[in-house]
Swiss-Prot record:
Organism of provenance: Rhizobium meliloti (strain 1021) (Ensifer meliloti)
A GO cellular-component term linked to this record: mismatch repair complex
Family under the similarity heading: Belongs to the DNA mismatch repair MutL/HexB family.
InterPro entries: DNA_mismatch_repair_CS, DNA_mismatch_repair_MutL, DNA_mismatch_S5_2-like, HATPase_C_sf, MutL/Mlh/PMS, MutL/Mlh/Pms-like, MutL_C, MutL_C_dimsub
Name the record gives this protein: DNA mismatch repair protein MutL
Span of the signal peptide: none
């Protein structure tokens, strides 16, 4: 069969198969065009889940009649010159409008501020008409009807109207988070479904609009910079988590992305504080030189490729962990909300059950302890003032000890208050200036012990055990090169490796804390991490996991009766210890109830 040139319509339909997968894809492309045009108000109207109608109206700069005729032609754009190395707009390929026009009934009406009248053009199944004069306001209205009517096979793969409408809503939410200065309105067949007024530079106010007030109340601000890359945004406290990753948003130079590297780094940052199967809520925005990121790696521009992925991964993990440490004594405010609901009289009517807390009350089961002997002695140690545990520094230790000597009235002014009682030999009730705090003594002390052990790991070289017979691990030569480049770092963590020929390394020492272990498996894991991310966290992660296991085993147990001075000492050390708001499994260590909440329970005004 002879080779022939495909028709322009068929070429556009092929492109549409990659660029326009569903109505939400078309909505994304049209909203991006509106934002690139400088719009401050964008209205999206849909019918039939976007399959019957999708209309995007903006107040951007509009187009001239000549530009309008070019806009519907493939690879015609005002956003790109001669290089892909410096892309500063959301769109740049010039594919969206011709792709949509090839599979739908497309009409565009537009006007610039300088023009007395607007212009309109229509494209039906790839066939266009000349631009014609039309009444129009400044800006652009793009109307898409009967999406995929020209490719009926694609319609068979569409989901229900409800599912397609939900996908469009998610696109609008992502765009609204990225552009707080823009007003977004989404309407369905008969009503407005989403409306986000512009919030200017107040990004947290926009987060509250999109993600709810609970996120605003439980968000930690992120702002860090490293080697020209800046990370900003908000991340939820560890105890404010979900059962899925739907509320994790990432942006690169304002572009919404679903990048595996960013999401992997987010998971790694929370690995020590959230139970397995739970997900943090976060909004992360990375700003860097456009020349350092390639946005042209996916038809939908949802993935990007960084020139230095290790830098970005390290920036995300470091910034989030620093923020969690800074705000580590915070627990989710939604815990108190759940407690308030449980006390409401109407809540206990027949057929109703108690609400499930936003954190995982039934966290993932503890993995089997491997080194009981290593943790022996923690539980038996004298705990009169808990002075042997969990002081992150000498200054905070002295402050905690001094705080235990405070008078009863003075103690109530501390953030976690003064201990008043112990319930069921497991929960400490403390009075604060404006309410009360209930502390899980085992979860709290577990965190204090873990922080002490982790500080010890980071403060000096980890003790190592020599292998009687070095273990030889065969690896590709480039993996060996990467491992040896980090050999000094591994030695500080107790893992001593040497080069053994061009395609192998010899393991001579392993961390003593890990006991008998699969040294070859660990080395291969480290090699894989270095190959993918240019950083190796597996060894440090194993050591910290063991420290968490030992801390759980060695903490003051549930069922142990504590004296008042012991309870107050625990409260003061929690205040002085980073990350004390949640235990090592991500559960909260305390819940706070304000006096106003308590008075409402008793009907007081």
């Amino acid at each position: 069969m002879a080779i022939k040139q495909l028709s322009e319509t068929l070429i556009n339909q092929i492109a549409a198969g990659e660029v326009i997968e569903r109505p939400a894809s078309a909505a994304k492309e049209l909203i991006e065009n509106a934002l690139d045009a400088g719009a401050t108000r964008i209205e999206i109207a849909t019918a039939g889940g976007g399959k019957t109608l999708l209309r995007v109206t903006d107040n951007g700069i509009g187009m001239s009649p000549a530009d309008l005729e070019l806009a519907i032609r493939r690879h015609c754009t005002s956003k790109l010159n001669d290089s892909l190395a410096d892309i500063r707009t959301l769109g740049f390929r010039g594919e969206a409008l011709p792709s949509i026009g090839s599979v739908a009934r497309l009409s565009i009406t537009t006007r610039t501020a300088e023009a007395r009248e607007g212009a309109a053009i229509t494209v039906t199944g790839g066939r266009s008409e000349p631009a014609r004069p039309s009444a129009a306001i400044v800006g652009t209205v793009v109307e898409v009807r009967d999406l995929f009517f020209a490719t009926p096979a694609r319609l068979k793969f569409m989901k229900s109207e409800k599912a397609e409408a939900a996908a469009i809503s998610e696109v609008v939410r992502r765009m609204a988070i990225a552009f707080p200065r823009v007003r977004f309105v989404l309407s369905g067949s008969d009503r407005t479904t989403l409306e986000f007024p512009a919030t200017g530079d107040d990004r947290l106010a926009r987060m509250a609009q999109v993600l709810g007030r609970d996120f605003r109340d439980n968000a930690i601000e992120i702002d860090a910079e490293r080697e020209g890359a800046r990370l900003t945004g908000f991340a939820g406290v560890p105890t404010f988590n979900r059962g899925n990753s739907l509320q994790q948003y990432a942006f690169v130079n304002g572009r919404p992305v679903q990048d595996k590297l960013i999401m992997s780094a987010l998971r790694a940052a929370y690995a020590e504080t959230i139970p397995q199967g739970r997900y943090p809520i976060a909004v992360l925005s990375i700003t860097l030189d456009p020349a350092l990121v390639d946005v042209n790696v996916h038809p939908a521009k949802s993935d990007v490729r960084f020139r230095d992925p290790g830098l970005i991964r390290g920036l995300i993990i470091g910034a989030i962990r620093e923020a969690l440490t800074r705000e580590g004594d915070r627990a989710a405010t939604t815990g108190a909300h759940g407690l308030m609901r449980a006390f409401r009289p109407e809540f206990h009517r027949a057929g109703q059950q108690r609400p499930q807390e936003p954190w995982s009350a039934a966290a993932s089961p503890h993995r089997p302890l491997r080194f009981e002997e290593a943790a022996r002695g923690f539980a038996e140690a004298p705990q009169a003032a808990f002075s042997d545990f969990a002081q992150p520094s000498a200054r905070s230790a002295a402050a905690a000890v001094e705080a235990t000597r405070a008078t009863d009235g003075q103690a109530a002014s501390f953030p976690l208050g003064a201990a008043r009682a112990q319930l069921h030999e497991n929960y400490i009730v403390a009075q604060t200036d404006d309410g009360l705090v209930i502390v899980d003594q085992h979860a709290a002390h577990e965190r204090l012990v873990f922080e002490t052990m982790r500080t010890a790991l980071h403060a000096r070289p980890v003790p190592a055990q020599a292998l009687l017979i070095p273990e030889i691990v065969g690896l590709p030569e480039d993996d060996c090169d990467r491992l040896m480049a980090h050999a000094e770092e591994f030695t500080r963590l107790g893992l001593a490796i040497e080069r053994f020929g061009p395609a192998a390394v010899a393991v001579r020492e392993t961390p003593a804390m890990l006991g008998e272990m699969d040294a070859a498996g660990l080395v291969r894991q480290l090699a894989d991490e270095l190959a993918e991310w240019d950083t190796a966290s597996g060894l440090a992660g194993r050591l910290e996991y063991l420290a968490a296991t030992m801390a759980c085993h060695g903490s003051v147990r549930s069922g142990r009766r504590l004296r008042t001075e012991e309870m107050n000492a625990l409260l003061r050390q929690m205040e002085a210890t980073p990350g004390s708001g949640q235990c090592n499994h991500g559960r909260p260590t305390y819940i706070e109830l304000k006096l106003a909440d308590i008075e409402r329970l008793f009907g007081r005004s």
